């Protein structure tokens, strides 16, 4: 079984990195244990959406971020943790599924943050990478601003002689 067979409701963003919706995660949860073991999952759902949800039991690692798709939600505190989980899984040769309910806003924000931190690109470039592979992405305005702030802070850290921004990103 290939990664695409196991995750039919996700789009491959780059080698081993998939962006999808809840159906992608539920498809993975129905896969055989040995197939699940080749995957790591980043779930971004509200507390309400998580109630009663059957999560994959045999994945290598599962990071659950509890967040609504709302303008008042700040995903910034989750960026470094999600990036570390994704980067670690990819370095170990695992496939990674990042998903939310629809695969449009929350999961796209987390995947874009990973690309910003991994590649040192700005927010529009990260979103363009995602959009090339998953045309329906559309982080809400607050999440887009958080990605812009992350990219600016990341760029400032990369420039010698520029004061390092506050920790927490």
Residue ranges and their predicted role:
Residues 87, 107-109, 158-159:
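A eukaryotic "domain-to-IDR transition" signal
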Residues 108-118:
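Short, small-residue alpha-helix embedded
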Residues 165-169:
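Intrinsically disordered, low-complexity regulatory segments in eukaryotic proteins
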